[in-house]
Amino acid sequence: MASESGLNGDPNILEEVSETKRDKEEEEEVKKTEKKDEEHEKTKTVPFYKLFAFADSFDFLLMILGTLGSIGNGLGFPLMTLLFGDLIDAFGENQTNTTDKVSKVALKFVWLGIGTFAAAFLQLSGWMISGERQAARIRSLYLKTILRQDIAFFDIDTNTGEVVGRMSGDTVLIQDAMGEKVGKAIQLLATFVGGFVIAFVRGWLLTLVMLSSIPLLVMAGALLAIVIAKTASRGQTAYAKAATVVEQTIGSIRTVASFTGEKQAISNYNKHLVTAYKAGVIEGGSTGLGLGTLFLVVFCSYALAVWYGGKLILDKGYTGGQVLNIIIAVLTGSMSLGQTSPCLSAFAAGQAAAYKMFETIERRPNIDSYSTNGKVLDDIKGDIELKDVYFTYPARPDEQIFRGFSLFISSGTTVALVGQSGSGKSTVVSLIERFYDPQAGDVLIDGINLKEFQLKWIRSKIGLVSQEPVLFTASIKDNIAYGKEDATTEEIKAAAELANASKFVDKLPQGLDTMVGEHGTQLSGGQKQRIAVARAILKDPRILLLDEATSALDAESERVVQEALDRIMVNRTTVVVAHRLSTVRNADMIAVIHQGKIVEKGSHTELLKDPEGAYSQLIRLQEEKKSDENAAEEQKMSSIESFKQSSLRKSSLGRSLSKGGSSRGNSSRHSFNMFGFPAGIDGNVVQDQEEDDTTQPKTEPKKVSIFRIAALNKPEIPVLILGSISAAANGVILPIFGILISSVIKAFFQPPKKLKEDTSFWAIIFMVLGFASIIAYPAQTFFFAIAGCKLVQRIRSMCFEKVVHMEVGWFDEPENSSGTIGARLSADAATIRGLVGDSLAQTVQNLSSILAGLIIAFLACWQLAFVVLAMLPLIALNGFLYMKFMKGFSADAKKMYGEASQVANDAVGSIRTVASFCAEDKVMNMYSKKCEGPMKNGIRQGIVSGIGFGFSFFVLFSSYAASFYVGARLVDDGKTTFDSVFRVFFALTMAAMAISQSSSLSPDSSKADVAAASIFAIMDRESKIDPSVESGRVLDNVKGDIELRHVSFKYPARPDVQIFQDLCLSIRAGKTVALVGESGSGKSTVIALLQRFYDPDSGEITLDGVEIKSLRLKWLRQQTGLVSQEPILFNETIRANIAYGKGGDASESEIVSSAELSNAHGFISGLQQGYDTMVGERGIQLSGGQKQRVAIARAIVKDPKVLLLDEATSALDAESERVVQDALDRVMVNRTTIVVAHRLSTIKNADVIAVVKNGVIVEKGKHDTLINIKDGVYASLVQLHLTAAS
């Protein structure tokens, strides 16, 4: 808002900038309304009882037992005050045979200890177990509801990062709010009520006077809770935004690396962290202020009580024991009310976190895959009709896709949809799958409106194979099995056979059990597609939707898959979306779509009769390129070319669905792993990892010393020192309070005149203590909040920086997937804060309490002090054992939940695939399986913690009994006086209170150790190929000569599959080299190696004769411009995406001219917001062709010396393809260019064509030379194209 006051402050400025002011004000207005909306969002919470909406009867039983335990445990202290009053009178009134009387009271203490032990056990284990169970249920319900949402929800309301963030972060907050904290709150409440009941029974008059301070207490407490809740949700919002940055960056790490975008990602992330830091500090300061006020009120009410109590002893005949019983009962009662604040803040945070989650859980989508309503027929014929359909994508309501679109497809026929990129072809597929409903008009199957069918059933009759196949992080077998519930291995094998996948599957070390990696990154595009086809075959659908299904395959697999598809297309209604006209020739009907209208339809031969028709023009466009070749070849080429026309376009769902926000991350997420189309993979990756885990758990890489973590807080040392001083002051307050109490006890048994003077004096001292605490508390929490929040910010920032600079191979490991790392950054950093800041405060406070306690005790009576001290180790041992137990569990639980969140991450990222295969239940089963382990651990932890917790109370009360008994003996023997006994007792019990508080922190500190280990594992790992390293050579003038000498290479994640052995290739400056070969032969791996995503295992790669390892990495990557098969765009404006190529510093004119060069300017200007159009998560708001053009503009803007085109034009329709190819031809001039392609037209004109097979280059030369080698590999590849096309 500063900018606003700046504008309105100075009238001269106003006149000068009236124009800009108006714009700014408009912006401000927009910001304000956005801000208001956000604020509105921030403060929404659910009512507390609603947190338990998902409890079952067993949970209720546990919660009832827990509640009874909490009440019993809470009454322990008030009952103790009763015994305590008896003790004081026993000591104070009898100067002889004290021991007798005292021992009777001491025995009661022991019984009280036993009762409290049982109650505390019930309390903690009841609440911890029910909390764990309910949180698990909420997690799975949330995922279940997310999976049932309609696709529009994913386009508009959420993204993968947010879902995983909520599942890992918010459920922790919710669990915190309904687990042991509820028990603690009930316990404190019981103490409060019990204390006051006892006080009233013993002496109502004094109690009433003390009660006058309660309204003040309550007000202070309430204020505290409100402030905490407000600031907590503000911080969460900022962290959620930061989590999205992590997800985007890691999900597209190859793009980030290639465009040296690490700095940008880091500064973007840090921006969100700063906001969260500020919120955290405010939260800390306000908490302290609230606590300080509470203590001030408490101590002042003491002062009042002491003074008034003295009066009552003189006037009303109260005894000293009675007065103290009342004071302490009221004190424990009200103190316990003050201690509820951490519980209240946990409740508030949980309620805020639950709001968004529960809102989602209750959301009923318009298109509901779980709904059992709707028709279920015996079978369908498969007539499809779109009738007068009007449609816009929900995420882009102002761009009309269809206006009155109609199309009829009769059952058993094949209809092909052709047209330019973005014309709405794939939208037809989305509507038939019922991913969306049209705004007007109907989609009918067999004459019945699609909306009338039961969604799950109708989807089970429709098979979808799309352009970007989405696989799940599971084995190949599991992936195929998505096609059919409980498919047998035989059926799966048969489907793989039909889809021509069994050849490459059999070659893999684990066969069908090979893991495919996150989003199938361990397979090449062609391999992924064949598995997707097998999955559709297994489903045996009535209606088959092929959205560019064979585009990602090389000629050989394409031919066989096409055959497989032809086989399964028989007697099915088939809708084919294709750019490549060869794919569509044999269709029964071809419909040409242009700008959301059907402009022509008919069979191939019919449509060709009209030479001016749209179809003929499309054909002509595809054939123009070949006019320079002789007629025969032209004939052949047209077919190949068109055949390969989109050959690499990896996917369609994404693309054109993407037109409307589709494929939310489906593929593009990892697209670049396509780089090596590595043919095999390693199932080992995942399995081995599990085996390792038994020997050296990955979750606890190595123990991290607390000093190392503390070192991260070094810059805050001054703040920490101030905080520690305040904490020490806070620690001394309680023991001093003990001295005051014992002095008051003595005063109560003095002669009247002395009694009057003494009570007035001590009352004033109590008030002084109160004012000390209103200074010390806020100081402590404020300073520690600064240090703690800075630490969280620093850890997140350092870790993220480290992660972004890791070599690309690191991200191929399953435990470094974007979901897991996102969860690590968000949860672990916060947990570590507990270890340094918050528990340091607690530790300093406890130490100073203990030291002060000991000094006071030894000065009062050293014999008794030793006896009481002998008891303290018992209390400490109990605390220590408790810590040990807690430690055992949290490590595994963390890894297990990490695996579960990967399942969620996968499913949400591929929501269209999950929906079209009705795989929601399957995903849920996988998820619950992964959650079973952590669940059991949580329960075990609850039981063990309960025992530890109960035992500490038993020890506490027994040691009280022992110390008073010994004190009585000492008084009888004349070794000490009764007020000294109380001084020792109070000093040490206040210290013990401090100890028991610190053991209550233990769940946090044991989690923090594991978190620290996992964070430092990242920080300590040196990136093998680190772009942030500034050393290395920089060449002044890059010519662009590239040479690969004797290169051997295996992907680090798949050490058993050799990609290259002894590969040699030299590329002269300014020349264009095309790499061809089958899918999985390693063509894209060359590009990955040139950008140093990986380093070869042996051999070397040079640029202008200099080995690239010796060059500065960042500089090297700036010399290369990469345009790849699945372009990854960031969820920013088009302008920002293009500028990304130049590190975000490109000028407007550079951006526009690169867009013009890449033929993107035209469509961008046509968009409502032009260059300021947001492209959506992973660019889903643009069609594939549009995304690709933006990606080319991004590569061109950095003016690279070496251009790497990995199937760059494959996703475009003929027209854009031609123009982009022109653009590429223009920018290829004087640049060394490496082209990876399946399509012949793209590579024919290359200066050199290199054919890669079995990891070596088997042929190279110009097209004309290679085509004439008899039985040559190239010639046979070309021949394949021709036969496939004809």
Swiss-Prot record:
It comes from Arabidopsis thaliana (Mouse-ear cress). One of its GO terms (cellular component) is membrane. Belongs to the ABC transporter superfamily. ABCB family. Multidrug resistance exporter (TC 3.A.1.201) subfamily. Gene3D superfamilies: ABC transporter type 1, transmembrane domain, P-loop containing nucleotide triphosphate hydrolases. ATP 2 binds at G1077, E1078, S1079, G1080, S1081, G1082, K1083, S1084. Residues 63-349, 720-1007 form the ABC transmembrane type-1 domain. This is ABC transporter B family member 4. One of its GO terms (biological process) is response to auxin. Residues 384-620, 1042-1279 form the ABC transporter domain. Pfam families: ABC_membrane (PF00664), ABC_tran (PF00005). Mostly expressed in roots, especially in the root elongation zone and lateral roots. In mature portion of the root, expressed in the epidermis and cortex. In the root elongation zone, confined to epidermis. In root tips, present in the root cap, S3 columella and epidermal cells. Interacts with 1-naphthylphthalamic acid (NPA). The chain crosses the membrane at residues 60-80, 109-129, 186-206, 208-228, 288-308, 317-337, 721-741, 764-784, 850-870, 871-891, 942-962, 976-996. The modification Phosphoserine is found at S671. It is found in: Cell membrane. Residues 646-669 have a biased composition (Low complexity). Residues 18-39, 625-636 have a biased composition (Basic and acidic residues). Phosphorylation level varies significantly during early response to bacterial elicitor. It is a multi-pass membrane protein. SMART domains: AAA. ATP 1 binds at G419, Q420, S421, G422, S423, G424, K425, S426. Glycans are attached at N94, N97, N500, N571, N666, N816, N846, N1131, N1230. One of its GO terms (molecular function) is auxin efflux transmembrane transporter activity.
